[in-house]
Design a protein with these regions (language model features):
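N-terminal, Lys/Arg- and Ser/Thr-rich interaction peptides
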Residues: 1-45
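Cell-envelope/glycan interface and biosynthesis
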Residues: 27-116
Length: 116
């Protein structure tokens, strides 16, 4: 899948089902992106879908089955969004809590593999 570059493509990407209860759109909101006018979409949608599916199927669905409905507000960060958050945090700006991009690969940044 190509990186969404239009409203229609982003809408379609957001409708990708990651598990029985979760869709990609559940994970894409970012306060940092909203405030700074940034796009919070993955450069590698296929890798992000694979990572998100594992998160949902292996962790979130079992938690939800045990404790009830889980509402996700945000989980994915693009490199651009995470990088800005890290810069703002390093500059002492309040409200930003982002590790470096490299430390967040395969963490918040789903479309990059970690070193392992």
């Amino acid at each position: 899948m190509r990186k969404p570059d239009s409203v229609a493509a982003l809408t379609e990407f957001g409708r990708v089902r990651l598990s029985k209860s979760f869709f990609m759109r559940d994970f894409l909101f970012s306060d940092i992106a909203a405030v700074h006018g940034l796009s919070n979409v993955p450069d590698d949608p296929d890798l992000a879908i694979a990572a998100g599916s594992r998160l949902c199927e292996e962790l979130l669905e079992p938690l939800q089955d045990r404790f009830g409905r889980i509402a996700i507000r945000s989980a994915f960060r693009s490199c651009e969004v995470n990088g800005l958050g890290n810069e703002m945090q390093a500059a002492g700006r309040g409200g930003y809590n982002c590790a470096s991009n490299e430390a967040n690969f395969a963490g918040h940044i789903w479309d990059r593999r970690d070193a392992q």
